[in-house]
């Protein structure tokens, strides 16, 4: 690990004092703990021999780091690999959200906090998860599809693109790009790319982001502001700015003393929550919760106007920063041994994170309304002469709660309560995923979608099923050809691992065509000798995945499960 920057050490000493600074620096040189969060929507139980994360119901510390890439349950969305401090966001949501809401996760990739809040939002809530960077928005969509909750929309937009959605969100989470000091021990590049100039760039950009999105928050709505850095400029100073300039009230969150959370370090009289690695078992995190006062004026924003935005973009001299996936691996399965070339995080100060807003606005009308390039959903497009395949409605539970439609060559199901809002979003945003993609038209055949296989409302009995061995499951996840038992019927078959759905194949008898998404496949042909899977000693997993009372160590019921 490289030496910590001397400027960072000095600013930290001034903020925390000599003893705390020294303790923090020692902690940043130590190994980080390994933690996961289980998916209550898929009835995932507590892992055996794991230790609970105290500030969330379904987070657990593991005794050792499994080879997550080679665990089929990881790819099935049965759990998410997430550092423990980040799970505190759920505590804030539970404290202030007790009815169905519309929530925006503005800077959401790779999706850890989105999957977290989706499981603790009340049933009937809608989550809009957004990421500005194109490549990272695809990662976000992948993780949320695997998580399986249908009350989710994924978008790929700059915060300024939400300007038409005035006062439409009850809750907004802004896990803003930052200087990444809290990630120093996870990635050496965070250290080598840190600078005091970068810190200044970040706090200015963070204010621009909050100012852009503030009009979208309802009167009385909740803004959750978070960073993964330690300095006061990006944390307490920005919270004070939001309160004074935008007319916000800073709110408390319930905590326990034994959790080791640190409060405000600047002496100001408002509650904030700092996770410092020498006091809490996790990475660095800062959280503040603010309420938009009813009838408050928007204020004179410091970061509006096209000239200011251009100057901000031109001021990104360092080009530093990166994006760490919280789990150290990409969702497509690149392992610690084979990291992808671009494993950088929204939290740092890469120049590309928030490009010139004027340019984006110019593209929005033409590009975003058309759905843009790639995999964005097309606005109202239909295949001529093709009607909705009614048989697909039987593929999901509670079909009466959904609005069914054809878009391009896809049959999709949108939660009925939010169908109108979805149509409104398509007018101004680039939507990558919404609801459930049930099937795709291939010739004259409606092929069941992988999104359907991952969904928590999949009706498994609508398809023949076959449970794969570990070797077969890894072959399937590598998108290799597999051969099923002769007793398995021909046609579309749902393949499972330990009775948890992995996806579909089309069984031809002599072989099965692998329908796993090409871009999500495990690229590594290497399989470690020791995998140490999360659930290796839990033989009753089949009962858990079916929601049986026989499931050992069940988790508390989730309101959105």
Regions found by a protein language model. Give the residues of each.
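Polybasic, low-complexity RNA-engagement segments
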Residues: 1-46, 293-561
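Glycine-rich nucleotide cofactor-binding entry segment
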Residues: 1-168, 200-205, 249-275, 393, ...
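Conserved proline-anchored active-site loop of SAM-dependent methyltransferases
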Residues: 103-113, 169-188, 285, 499
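A structural alpha-helix within SAM-dependent methyltransferase catalytic domains
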Residues: 118, 207-214, 240-243
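Helix-to-beta-strand junctions that scaffold the AdoMet/dcAdoMet cofactor pocket
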Residues: 122, 217-219
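A short hydrophobic/small-residue beta-strand
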Residues: 127, 223-224
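Mobile active-site "lid"/loop adjacent to the S-adenosyl-L-methionine
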Residues: 135, 170-212, 224, 228-235, ...
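Core SAM-dependent methyltransferase catalytic element
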Residues: 269-306
